[in-house]
């Protein structure tokens, strides 16, 4: 319980400074698991999805709510409840939700064979295991995404295979979730800066027989964009320094400010060491039409 509420507190502190965040919930015990407190058994994932969602909605950023991504491994025994959570109108309205699919699950869905869920998900000796129909659960994911636009899917084994930072997992760069809109997978306390290049703007003589894409200009601008993004990291670090100065100068007792101060110190260190950036594209459809 302590870790769950620590995440909630850190989320609120981040969002009050106009930040967004992604949480992976795969560490939470499945519903019905024994716990050593007065509740005796765990309530599972869904109540905590609601808690994090409500925190996002409650902390306004200049009148706008924060941004939150919740994810869970398909290996988790409560993943089906997670997948169904937003099918009820009014539930988990403050978060995007995505399910992390592994190669084993996708192969089982194709072959029509059972798939084993367990908790803890990466344990060699799990305390809980169950078999499910992978094909049926995959069809439910597709149906729910069609019906409510969620959950999103993260092909997690592919993400990890192609993730350069995971070469440094032993140094704290093990990828655990994504930013709120899912563009970039990140490790705990890491942050991202994203820039999109408008492809339509590189179409010369659009909507004519002489239309062509200016690859040379595009190549030049991609290099400049990445250069700019690296500079933005340093600007962000300066901003975090000012945030920490503001926290230090606030009149509250140090024990009240400690969680937020430690949080921003972790983000500052991870941002400076990892220097994560993302350069993407937009207006691909307009480019093709032109």
Language-model-derived ranges and their functions:
Residues 231, 235-237, 242-290:
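Core structural elements
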Residues 1-221, 225, 234-248, 263-270:
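Active-site cavity-forming subdomains of large catalytic enzyme subunits
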């Amino acid at each position: 319980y302590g870790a769950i509420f620590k995440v909630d507190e850190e989320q609120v502190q981040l969002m009050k400074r106009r930040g967004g965040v992604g949480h992976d919930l795969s560490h939470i015990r499945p519903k019905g698991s024994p716990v050593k407190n007065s509740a005796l058994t765990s309530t599972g994932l869904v109540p905590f999805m609601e808690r994090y969602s409500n925190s996002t909605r409650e902390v306004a950023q200049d009148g706008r709510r924060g941004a939150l991504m919740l994810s869970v491994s398909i290996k988790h025994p409560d993943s089906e409840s997670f997948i169904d959570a937003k099918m009820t109108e009014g539930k988990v309205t403050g978060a995007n939700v995505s399910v992390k699919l592994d190669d084993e699950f996708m192969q089982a869905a194709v072959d029509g064979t059972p798939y084993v869920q367990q908790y803890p998900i990466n344990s060699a000796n799990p305390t809980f295991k169950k078999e499910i129909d992978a094909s049926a659960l995959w069809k439910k994911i597709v149906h729910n995404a069609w019906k409510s636009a969620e959950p999103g899917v993260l092909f997690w084994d592919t993400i990890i295979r192609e993730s350069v930072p995971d070469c440094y997992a032993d140094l704290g760069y093990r990828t655990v979730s994504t930013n709120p809109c899912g563009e970039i997978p990140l490790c705990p306390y890491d942050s991202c800066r994203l820039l999109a290049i408008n492809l339509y703007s590189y179409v010369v003589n659009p909507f004519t027989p002489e239309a062509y894409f200016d690859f040379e200009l595009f190549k030049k601008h991609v290099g400049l964009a990445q250069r700019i993004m690296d500079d933005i990291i340093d600007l962000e670090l300066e901003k975090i320094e000012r945030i920490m100065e503001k926290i230090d100068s606030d009149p509250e007792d140090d024990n009240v400010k400690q969680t937020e101060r430690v949080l921003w110190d972790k983000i500052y260190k991870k941002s400076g060491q990892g220097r994560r950036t993302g350069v993407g594209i937009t207006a691909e459809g307009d480019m093709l039409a032109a």
